[in-house]
């Protein structure tokens, strides 16, 4: 892969989720040991934080995650479902749960925080000393989805 960004002697490439999963799933052609199995490159856990709503196609990401997690492994997630512009399938939390279950995940924990969490340096404040006139009436917030799912 050719570096996408460089500064002086430092360069780096940002891989997509699909590229990272492909590395985990690729066969090791140099290994002729018949005692190895298909779970050599699988992981015991995947943790996604403020991530899944960046998917263009969440169905693909759920299937990929299922493919890279070893049997008995878990997927832990926390973050909003504020789908980015490039999302072709912006699903609700309930729809996402159905997708996970139909893909073969067992849901161990599932919750949506009841209180919204503000972000983007909101000007909204309840600090004493600020008048209502100086407080913004607009703020960005989300209620994070938290789940733990296990691959049987």
Task: Please place each PLM-identified region on the residue numbering.
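Conserved Class I S-adenosyl-L-methionine
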Residues: 86-117, 123-124
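S-adenosyl-L-methionine
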Residues: 1-39
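A short glycine-rich, Lys/Arg-flanked "PGG" loop and its adjoining helix->strand segment in the class I
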Residues: 59-71
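Core SAM-dependent methyltransferase catalytic element
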Residues: 103, 119-152
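A short SAM/SAH-binding and catalytic strip from SAM-dependent methyltransferases
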Residues: 44-58
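Short, contiguous acidic/charged loop-to-helix segments that flank catalytic cores in large enzymes
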Residues: 37-38, 52-56, 82-91, 136-137
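Extended, charge-rich low-complexity regions and/or helical-solenoid scaffolds
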Residues: 39-40, 102-104, 108, 150-151
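Conserved beta-strand signature within the Rossmann-like core of class I S-adenosyl-L-methionine
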Residues: 72-84
């Amino acid at each position: 892969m050719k570096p996408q960004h460089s500064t002086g002697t430092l360069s780096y490439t940002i891989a997509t989720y699909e590229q990272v999963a492909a590395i985990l799933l690729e066969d090791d052609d140099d290994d002729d040991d018949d005692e190895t199995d298909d779970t050599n490159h699988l992981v015991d856990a995947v943790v996604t934080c403020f991530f899944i709503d960046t998917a263009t196609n969440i169905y693909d990401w759920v299937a990929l995650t299922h493919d890279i997690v070893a049997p008995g492994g878990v997927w832990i997630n926390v973050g909003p479902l504020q789908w980015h512009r490039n999302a072709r399938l912006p699903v609700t939390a309930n729809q996402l749960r159905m997708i996970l279950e139909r893909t073969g995940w067992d849901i161990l924990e599932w919750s949506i925080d009841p209180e919204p969490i503000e972000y983007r340096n909101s000007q909204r404040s309840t600090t004493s000393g600020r008048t209502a006139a100086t407080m913004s009436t607009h703020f960005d917030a989300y209620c994070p989805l938290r789940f733990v799912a296990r691959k049987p």
